[in-house]
Amino acid sequence: MLGETMIGTGGVIPPPPEYWPMVCEICKANDVLVINDEVITGFGRAGTWFGFEQFGSDPDLITLAKGLSSGYLPLGAVGAKDHVFDAFLGGPGEAFMSGATYMGHPLCCAAGIANLEIVEREKLVERCAELGPYLQDGLGTLRSHAIVGDVRGVGLVAGIEYVKDKATREWFAPAQGVAAKIRDEAFQRGVFVRMLGGGHVHAVAPPFIISKEQIDTVVRVLDESIGVVEKQFGY
């Protein structure tokens, strides 16, 4: 069973609290491995070293990238529990022999080690845990807008979903470009947000070193930008 710990590109959608515990219980009862994709939530963004710690998952394997090297050089990895890792070991004729051309690339691995040393030394995971609620609470005030159907997230990653009708949760037609217009308004004011979820959601994922004052600026700019576009559509 392979799944993102929290849906990312699909719209920044955290799972219900009971989801991963139930998945793990069912899988382990049927001898099925659980694999969490931690490419987005790994290495601090969720407010813990790994996102599965936030959502009650107990994976056998995890996929890792992005935060492993902070993007300075391309680096990915797989983490495995002993009972999975040990299955690859053995003597001649027993070990699982496999390789890849760029596996264990020394330069990329050195960048990853240096990156993780900085994250640990500067306590950036703890910083995400501290600033995450501040970001989520600030963005939560945007729910007062008529076209904001949901604000959700964990740690220093959040999604803002735009809807035509809050009661029905109906989206705007893609051709109306509501999220794109808000993005452009925000960009003119110095804040960049990324469109996800089929163009109906903005992702807010600031760097770990963002300050509370800068978070206030992000919230203010998005509030202004949403207000401008709302008026254009008659709200």
Each model region followed by its residue ranges:
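Conserved N-terminal phosphate-binding loop of PLP-dependent enzymes in the Aspartate aminotransferase
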Residues: L2-Y235
